[in-house]
Amino acid sequence: MIETTRPELVAYQEERLAKFVNENQKLDKGQIVFAGDSITEFFALKKYLGRDFPLVNRGIAGTDSVWLLEHLKEQVLDLEPSKLVLLIGINDIGRGYPIRDIVNRISDIIMTVRQESLLTEVYLLSVFPVSEKSQYAAKVKIRNNASVGELNQQLAVLPGVTYVDLYDYLTDAQGQLNDTYTTDGLHLSPQGYQVLAEPIKKEILE
């Protein structure tokens, strides 16, 4: 089943974006910005990554590369980040977009940041695995690891960005998103975020 965006989710997204616009006037420039969808939004950055880093969470649930490209200024660029950590694409797969189109939009996001915010280092996280087990089908819908793997293979060679591959940290012996690390086959549990903390600190923050 292809995922559609419900009106109440759109209202939430617009409300969260408006909150960002208001915050942009007050926040210091040059912080480390994490941008993406719900997996980023639900990432309690200071809890898992510590308070030694100037971290800003700019995740918005239910968004995809179409949304992020359209709202990049308000969500990211106005903060003039020292580093940008991107995690986007799983909802594009959920909406049935061709892999080639997803890659092109993410490439456009990266190039726009590099042109508009010259001092920003851009890091692109691999799209995370899902669990294709039957109990998670209602949430995961048409998302699948074959598509995620195809997308990641192309994201890994994009120019102008540091690609950070976290995929295997989250998989079980069958290559699925580990039950311990997920709440619903798609989103991460506290244990899932915890297992990513050290590689993110090592590869990006330190």
Stretches with model-predicted labels:
Residues 4-7, 52-65, 185:
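Acidic/histidine-rich helix-loop elements
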Residues 2, 129-206:
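Catalytic His-Asp segment of secreted/periplasmic serine-dependent ester chemistry enzymes
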Residues 41-54, 66-104, 129-131:
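Oxyanion-hole/transition-state-stabilizing segment in secreted/luminal serine hydrolases
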Residues 117-121:
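A short helix->loop->beta-strand "cap" motif at the edges of active sites that frequently abuts
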Residues 34, 86, 123-126:
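Structural beta-sheet core signal
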